[in-house]
């Protein structure tokens, strides 16, 4: 059995004397996808999901014989992730270190990456579900892993949800006093190529939709689990007007029934229209209005 740790420390924030964290959505997606397969579920044990920027020494000391540690790297956790990875490799030289996420994807010359980060065993570019699953299988079977994984995009998005498959149940149960922020994807990709933006490496790419029923179920999960703040992570929310109106109507209904989410944030479709403005007005008039405002300017 391989011992797996997943790391995606995000911002900590405070509201009314309580501490809040973002649910580590990206890294959760990798595990919900990989663990749907029996061979991985039977041979890999998820030991912990690390969502806090813990003291490096304390974190390394509490690891239990790690075989694999995967990091979802962003600009706000980049330095921390590198230091943790370096220290883990010093303590556990056989442990495989996997880096992915936008901060890795943005590296201009991947071949040079390992010269500057020799403690990293492999990096995954762009979407990570397929490559992460392949990495786990190779390690399970005693095969060598590649230095760089850059797989094509998923052909469809009918994939397991980290919310609905229980990936986050343990960290929520173990941290009862924490306010959680959630991330929601209704689609992936972006047809534009704005000079200032790189939407996870998927700019100027075909839009692919998550199943509508899955999105609605995730919204219910977030309301029931009292996600105070929800970010809709689409590059162009509102591009599918009728579908996205249905999602906002569900958000309004859930907020009225359960009081959550209290804040919703979205990046809106470039080509604003009266229909999209109706979506905005629909939510603002409901009281879910502290974050759901149009951000439509693209260049």
Question: Where are the predicted features?
Answer:
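Radical SAM [4Fe-4S] cluster-binding motif and immediate context
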Residues: 22, 163-299
